[in-house]
């Protein structure tokens, strides 16, 4: 709730800022406070009934990914009609309203950690060393995020260069990706039934195949190329979201009392992957255009699949997990 209030204030200040330096500082602060979205996920896991954690976490993550995908469309329309400052003011109001709703509906639950904040940060290193499953999940999801970010960061550039379309059209492709994200609760239910490890493998495979399908773009007419890009967006967003929900189910089971820290470590991999994807995507575009971006995304999905297929749970990890519980 404190982050919610702080984020609303930062977004409001951002809308009135005019200098480059103040925008940079406020961008940093907005990014720090926006991590409140990740605080909701372990809370949902804690409140989930036994046997339904995957489904419920999947539902929460659907909202999170839909926000990411649809933000392009919504911000593009509002900014074009009213200016970018209005978009930030509306965002500030929506976050303030979200905080009010959370304050009214979220129950109070006990904290498991009694350590100081520096000690909590230090303990995260121990969690990282103790659980190979956590390391594998963070790395696999990080590589999937590289492909995701490379695609979305360069899509508008490609559409402008090859189809002479504006950023609003690129934002509309987010609607296609949102269709894939809507299936996340189903993937959560499948994790509960068949095990999250299998879902991560299938999700990574779907991401790789969806990106690889775009190698066929030069063989198609312009209208069919756009259709294939939209279908690929549905496919890899579904695969990425399914893998993310399953990875969360995996890591939350390692040490239930440390779910918040485990989630932070998992999403460190996600955010590092997002940043690398934007950087590498622009480099790939400069070197070889859209085919190079597709190759990068396909390779990233393939690496994630290899990680998921080759990782096994070690006896020492099982012992550590049982001791923690």
What are these regions (language model features)?
Residues 1-12, 92, 199-213:
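Structural signature of the two symmetry-related core transmembrane helices
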Residues 10, 21-29, 227-233:
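Paired small-residue
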Residues 26-63:
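Cytoplasmic helix-loop-helix junction between adjacent transmembrane helices
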Residues 1, 183-196, 285:
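Helix-to-loop junctions at the C-terminal end of transmembrane segments
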Residues 198-246:
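C-terminal transmembrane helical hairpin of 12-TM major facilitator-type secondary transporters
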Residues 106-138:
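Juxtamembrane intracellular "pre-TM" segments in multi-pass secondary transporters
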Residues 22, 59-106:
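Helix-loop-helix hairpin linking two adjacent transmembrane segments in secondary transporters
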């Amino acid at each position: 709730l404190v982050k919610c209030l702080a984020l609303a204030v930062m977004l409001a200040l951002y809308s009135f800022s005019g200098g480059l330096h103040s925008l940079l500082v406020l961008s940093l602060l907005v990014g720090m406070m926006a991590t409140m979205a990740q605080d909701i996920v372990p809370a949902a896991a804690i409140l989930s009934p036994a046997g339904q954690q995957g489904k419920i976490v999947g539902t929460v993550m659907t909202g999170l990914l839909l926000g990411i995908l649809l933000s392009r469309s919504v911000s593009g329309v509002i900014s074009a009609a009213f200016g970018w400052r209005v978009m930030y003011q509306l965002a500030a109001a929506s976050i303030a309203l979200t905080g009010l709703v959370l304050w009214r509906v979220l129950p109070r639950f006990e904290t498991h950690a009694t350590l100081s904040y520096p000690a909590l940060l230090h303990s995260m290193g121990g969690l990282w060393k103790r659980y190979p499953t956590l390391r594998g999940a963070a790395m696999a999801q990080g590589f999937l995020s590289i492909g995701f970010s490379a695609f979305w960061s360069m899509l508008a550039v490609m559409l402008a260069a090859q189809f002479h379309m504006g950023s609003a059209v690129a934002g509309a492709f987010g609607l296609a990706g949102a269709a894939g994200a809507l299936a996340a609760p189903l993937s959560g239910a499948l994790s509960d039934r068949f095990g999250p490890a299998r879902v991560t493998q299938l999700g990574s495979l779907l991401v790789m195949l969806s990106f690889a399908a775009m190698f066929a773009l030069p063989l198609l007419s312009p209208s069919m190329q756009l259709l294939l890009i939209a279908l690929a967006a549905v496919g890899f967003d579904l695969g990425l979201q399914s893998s993310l929900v399953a990875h969360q189910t995996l890591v939350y089971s390692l040490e239930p009392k440390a779910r918040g820290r485990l989630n932070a470590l998992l999403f460190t991999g996600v955010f590092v992957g997002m940043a690398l994807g934007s950087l590498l995507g622009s480099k790939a575009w400069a070197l070889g255009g859209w085919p190079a971006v597709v190759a990068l995304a396909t390779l990233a999905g393939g690496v994630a699949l290899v990680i998921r297929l080759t990782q096994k749970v070690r006896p020492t990890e099982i012992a550590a997990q049982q001791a923690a519980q």
